[in-house]
């Protein structure tokens, strides 16, 4: 339960244990679950954390940006993972600055960070290294199934992106 001392939507699993690795690598990997964090730490990715609760919030991002300006979200490649990534991305738009680098990676084949890092830590490292920048993720998501040679699709794209651009400080 939440209280005056504990606000779940602002806490991150593994942050205390990750601080040294985050400082050394100047990067934070954010995953969806606690078991992912445990496996990643065991497999050499001590700079990983997970949000407590059900979703990543602006409060989480504000806290993490104190430790590194390089944030990598790592989600499952399924529909739920893409939805979680979109929500995280929109939360990031209000907080990013010129010196902030946010990127998104997705694990395919029905695996999660726990499984992939246990089976092949180098493959997990590649997933993180090949992350999409926030802008690439944003544009790829909005342009999916659109043809900008068609005026109707240009209109859809413009209507979709303008509210997001307005979130950026």
Segment roles from a protein language model:
Residues 1, 6, 13-16, 34, ...:
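Aromatic side chains
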Residues 1-67, 71, 84-85:
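Phosphate-handling DNA/RNA-contact segment within nucleic-acid enzymes
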Residues 3-10, 52, 56, 76-84, ...:
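Catalytic cores of large soluble enzymes that bind and process phosphate-bearing ligands
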Residues 19, 65, 89, 162-166:
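Generic hydrophobic alpha-helical scaffold/packing signal
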Residues 23, 54-109, 115-121:
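Conserved catalytic cores of soluble enzyme domains
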Residues 99-169:
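C-terminal or mid-to-C-terminal helical accessory/interaction module adjacent to the motor/catalytic core
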């Amino acid at each position: 339960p939440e209280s005056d001392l504990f606000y779940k939507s602002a806490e991150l699993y593994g942050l205390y244990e990750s601080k040294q690795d985050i400082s050394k690598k100047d990067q934070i990997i954010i995953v969806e679950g606690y078991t992912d964090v445990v496996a990643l730490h065991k497999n050499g990715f001590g700079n990983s954390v997970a949000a407590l609760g059900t979703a990543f919030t602006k409060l989480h991002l504000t806290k993490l940006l104190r430790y590194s300006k390089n944030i990598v979200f790592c989600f499952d490649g399924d529909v739920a993972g893409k939805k979680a990534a979109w929500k995280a991305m929109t939360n990031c738009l209000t907080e990013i600055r010129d010196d902030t680098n946010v990127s998104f990676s997705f694990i395919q084949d029905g695996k999660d960070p726990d499984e992939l890092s246990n089976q092949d830590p180098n493959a997990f490292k590649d997933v993180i290294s090949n992350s999409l920048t926030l802008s690439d993720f944003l544009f790829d998501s909005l342009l999916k199934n659109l043809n900008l040679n068609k005026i109707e699709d240009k209109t859809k794209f413009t209507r979709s992106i303008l509210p997001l651009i307005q979130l950026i400080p």
